[in-house]
Design a protein with these regions (language model features):
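Short hydrophobic targeting helices and cationic amphipathic motifs
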Residues: 3-6
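Terminal targeting signals and extreme-terminal segments of soluble enzymes
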Residues: 11-95, 101-156
Length: 156
């Protein structure tokens, strides 16, 4: 019985180290403060929700922003795009689907889908540069290959 447990445990460890991470879904509830006078979620909140989903994605992919920053690197936002399809309202439960869709040694691109009960509300993208804390571009693949591999394993 314990031998079987060890076999399964070892199999799960091997499997988890080889299985590609495929995105993450975060849930947010539209708060009253996030709505306008008409009760519709204000457009500026989507950027915040994208960040929530992106940081949840990074944690779920077992990438540590803290470790990346300890190495002296940061990933500032360089562009943000959002296409609104339908309105979101106060108390809506929104699912933010985040995935890493592009990776280069100096840049990351995340894509987002915002849904409510499976209905598409918005789509978006954010692009992030890879720079030192002094804001100098860095080739992470060359200078920190272990960090690059973590992002590569999370690539959709």
């Amino acid at each position: 019985e314990s031998l079987h447990y060890l076999d399964v445990s070892m199999f799960n460890h091997i499997l988890s180290s080889r299985v590609k991470f495929m995105g993450h879904i975060s849930t947010v509830e539209v708060r009253y403060a996030e709505t306008d006078q008409m009760g519709i979620a204000h457009h500026s909140n989507y950027a915040v929700w994208f960040e929530v989903a992106r940081t949840d994605f990074i944690k779920a992919a077992r990438i540590s922003y803290t470790d990346v920053e300890k190495e002296g690197n940061i990933t500032p936002l360089t562009s943000l795009e959002c296409k609104y399809k339908k309105a979101a309202f106060y108390e809506d439960q929104l699912q933010i689907h985040a995935s890493l869709t592009k990776l280069s040694p100096v840049r990351l691109e995340f894509s987002y889908k915002v849904t409510r009960d499976g209905d598409l509300i918005a789509t978006g993208k954010t692009t992030h540069g890879m720079v030192t804390k002094d804001l100098k571009p860095i080739n992470v693949k060359k200078e920190h290959p272990e960090i690059y591999r973590m992002f590569e394993n999370a690539l959709d």
